[in-house]
Amino acid sequence: MVATLTRALGSRHLTVAEDAVQDALLTAMQQWPFRGVPEHPEAWLFQVARNRALDRLRHGKMAADKEPALARESATVALPSAAPLLREEWPAVEDDELGLLFLTCHPALPADARVALALKLAGGFSVGEIARAFLSQESTIAQRLVRAKRQLRDEHVSFGTPAPHELGERLDSVIDALYLMFNEGYAATAGDQLVRDEVAFEAIRLAGMLAAHPATVCPRVWALLALMLLHAARFPARIDSEGTLFLLRDQDRRMWDRATIAEGLRALDRAAAGETVTALHLEAGIAACHAAAPSWDATDWPQIVELYDELLALTHSPVVAVNRAVAVSRIDGPLAGLAALDAIENASALERYPLLPAIQAELWREAGDLERAAACYRAALGLARSSPEHRWLTSRLSLLV
């Protein structure tokens, strides 16, 4: 409903649309328990939201301009129903939903604002839920959302799917925002929870929406979806009921969601249809190698190193180089892995990255130098950002001292 109202009102009245829908839902909560649910609840909600929007605009003397557009929407409104998270054929998406996603992920907005706005408007998250997901104060998130909406209004950003000549750049912005959203769900940057399923699954839903629409479906969207699904399949094995972290090496692979893996592999097959190999394709390929391996030791490490080599050549990312070093250590031993870590270019960018000393600690432990391993574990503890990471590092250090 927010998307449909925003299309009718224009993106500069995004807040009006959002408030009108909230008013309609509140009215339903107050009336339906006593008067019963109307025969067509979606149409009823839209009509109430439409009237609330007009009331708000009348105060600004703009209702007359918008009433014809709202009337057209009232006559044709057909809101999408909820769909399963994962399925072989992704549900069709309404153009209004897609337009709202492009609006929230406009490249003019800062990356953190795109993710927050997408969760709020395209995902339906409350300010409180977003604040909890990112361990921020509600006031901080509320201010971020207000600034983002003001920027969209001031820059006269239009609502809807971009024109063909600008679709590529705009789609990249949406993909980047969803990638960040999923990463925050997969490994939260701070707090008591490492995995925030609700954020990761919302990123998957929105990526599936892109894959289901003819205007946005393309190989890199399928690659994004494949990457998300293949990682999400391991969620049940990453954290136990007490919040204990299990690295990939130590996970019980019987707990992996095989249906989600199959869905991810199908998405990866569809991603292969294009001629361009992107970083998303390579990351999804690495995730597929892990998903296919019966055990840590039986993983196709040479193939993974090859994929990391391609990814490193494409991105020049020091984080990619760290992950590549782990794969090298599985083939040539811990000292080779440590040498690969020492050879990383732009290593200064990793000064606050806890995974680097944690990996060094593991490799020194495997090499038999427990003193160096303990020192690296302590360094990693000083950088750990979440409680599960801190507990895991503490437990590893306790085995050495």
Q: What is each model feature region?
A:
Residues 60, 68-129, 136-309:
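Amphipathic helix-loop-helix modules that constitute alpha-helical solenoid scaffolds
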Residues 1, 20, 24, 44-49, ...:
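Residue-level preference for hydrophobic side chains embedded in well-ordered alpha helices
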